């Protein structure tokens, strides 16, 4: 998408809602997450893949899955051990027991806190927080939830003790420090693919998240019916798998991360799969066990999928396909210029907390758009919706090829009580589009970001 007020077709190119650039912030470890990937600020549309009718893409095919985890054993409360190595103000630091690694139980470092005051009837709602690649347990992520009335646990999923000075870390201690009872560290994306299942990082990351749920459910101050899960980047991919394996969660919110990694046209992801990497058996195991695509059809809880329009790691096609594959209610939140990073992934999308409040506190729901359609006589895109919008736009592209390289343009919509209608027709050659809305409040604050399904138009 290029700067400017319009193109040769008279289409708007930068709606006021999306002017600007990516903000500064402490990102997910870019070396780990985006290796061999040249990151450009290129808008990409998002959302659920529309598959009805002859002109759009086909339904995702189901994948036969295998479950390498002993879910029954992981559903039992884990043992907890004291931790003095990495204190954080206002919260508990401890180890809890994870899955066995090479015949020995692992210990998982975690921060945990509850809101101040007396718990509500039934106990606090709670959230499990799964970090992304190169990340760790972050105190400020826990604090973001506790200030909103939730208990929260954030754990290190890479066999490390927390370190550094970002996101509430204290002491500026070394990054990536291990401990004697750690499980396996992550080896790039799939560098451990030749190892036995129970020695691979994804196996332990998923198990550690399930165990965190089991721990919360055992605490007397927690309401076991109101425990949610969220993950950022690679953590978003992990929680997308957990959603289909651990049915006890009340809601799941993947941020940036998703499934169908093997179908990505991002060179940094595609390099790990055949023909460059993985044997035929390893690829079969990956699809059946480790990719969220195998497990998402079994995820029946409400899910909110959150990303920016220019995410540099998980492109629109696989993100949208993941959302469509989920077996329960699946909603999408499109935040223009949501930078890919820890901090950004919990601070810059208030819809995360609106969604959680709706599920476990009875708060108002996020808006919901129906599948957009094109009037065959006029070429005008439109969709019905429920919710509170003051502004809406059609995002469309006439480009093909890699999603990262596609250019996107915009057409403003008229907002009526129940329908969003584009003010101009889509140009010939449109290859994909969606309709996106939000509410502008006092001080130009934008909220209620939501988008329709992504429609891919085949030639």
Regions flagged by a language model, labelled:
Residues 143-207, 258-273:
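Cap/lid segment of the alpha/beta-hydrolase catalytic domain
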Residues 210-275:
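Primarily recognizes the serine-hydrolase "nucleophile elbow" in alpha/beta-hydrolase
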Residues 121-132:
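Short beta-strand element of the alpha/beta-hydrolase
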Residues 72-122:
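N-terminal cap/lid segment of alpha/beta-hydrolase-fold proteins
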Residues 299, 305-307:
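Short beta-strand/loop motif that positions the catalytic acidic residue
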Residues 121-123, 187-232:
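Gly/Ser-rich "nucleophile elbow"/oxyanion-hole loop immediately N-terminal to the catalytic nucleophile
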Residues 312, 316-375, 387-388:
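Catalytic cores of secreted or luminal carbohydrate-active enzymes
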Residues 357-396, 409-419, 423:
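Surface beta-strand/loop "capping" patches
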């Amino acid at each position: 998408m290029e700067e400017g007020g319009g193109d040769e077709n008279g289409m708007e190119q930068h709606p006021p809602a999306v002017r600007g650039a990516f903000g500064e912030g402490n990102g997910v470890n870019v070396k780990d997450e985006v290796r061999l990937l040249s990151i450009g600020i290129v808008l990409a549309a998002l959302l659920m893949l529309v598959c009805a009718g002859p002109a759009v893409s086909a339904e995702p095919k189901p994948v036969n899955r295998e479950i390498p985890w002993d879910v029954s054993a992981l559903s039992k409360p884990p043992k907890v051990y004291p931790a003095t190595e990495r204190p954080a103000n206002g919260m508990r630091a401890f180890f809890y027991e994870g899955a066995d690694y090479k015949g020995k139980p692992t210990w998982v470092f975690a921060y945990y806190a509850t809101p101040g005051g007396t718990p509500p009837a039934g106990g606090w709602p709670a959230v499990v927080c799964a970090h992304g690649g190169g990340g760790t347990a972050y105190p400020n992520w826990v604090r973001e939830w506790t200030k909103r009335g939730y208990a929260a646990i954030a754990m290190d999923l890479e066999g490390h003790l927390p370190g550094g000075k970002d996101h509430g870390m204290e002491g500026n201690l070394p990054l990536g420090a291990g401990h004697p009872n750690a499980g396996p560290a992550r080896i790039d994306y799939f560098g451990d693919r030749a190892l036995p299942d129970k020695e691979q990082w994804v196996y332990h990351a998923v198990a550690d998240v399930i165990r965190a749920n089991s721990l919360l459910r055992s605490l007397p101050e927690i309401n076991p019916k109101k425990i949610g899960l969220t993950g950022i980047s690679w953590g978003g991919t992990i929680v997308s798998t957990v959603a289909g394996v651990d049915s006890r969660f009340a809601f799941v919110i993947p941020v940036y991360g998703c499934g169908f990694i093997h179908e990505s046209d991002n060179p940094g992801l595609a390099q790990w799969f055949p023909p460059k990497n993985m044997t035929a058996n390893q690829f079969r195991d990956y699809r059946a066990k480790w990719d969220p695509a195998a497990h998402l059809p079994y995820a029946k809880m409400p899910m909110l999928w959150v990303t920016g329009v220019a995410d540099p790691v998980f492109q629109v096609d696989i993100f949208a396909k993941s959302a469509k594959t989920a077996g329960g209610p699946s909603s999408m939140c499109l935040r223009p210029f949501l930078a890919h990073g820890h901090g950004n992934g919990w601070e810059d999308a208030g819809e995360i907390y609106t969604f959680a409040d709706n599920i476990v506190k009875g708060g108002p729901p996020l808006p919901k758009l129906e599948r957009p359609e094109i009037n065959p006589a006029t070429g005008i895109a439109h969709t019905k919706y429920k919710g509170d919008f003051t502004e809406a736009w059609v995002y469309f592209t006439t480009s093909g090829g890699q999603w990262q390289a596609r250019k996107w343009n915009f057409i403003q919509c008229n907002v009526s009580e129940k329908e969003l209608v584009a003010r101009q027709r889509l140009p010939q050659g449109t290859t994909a589009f969606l309709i996106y809305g939000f509410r502008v409040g006092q001080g130009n604050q934008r909220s209620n970001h939501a988008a329709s399904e992504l429609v891919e138009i085949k030639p």
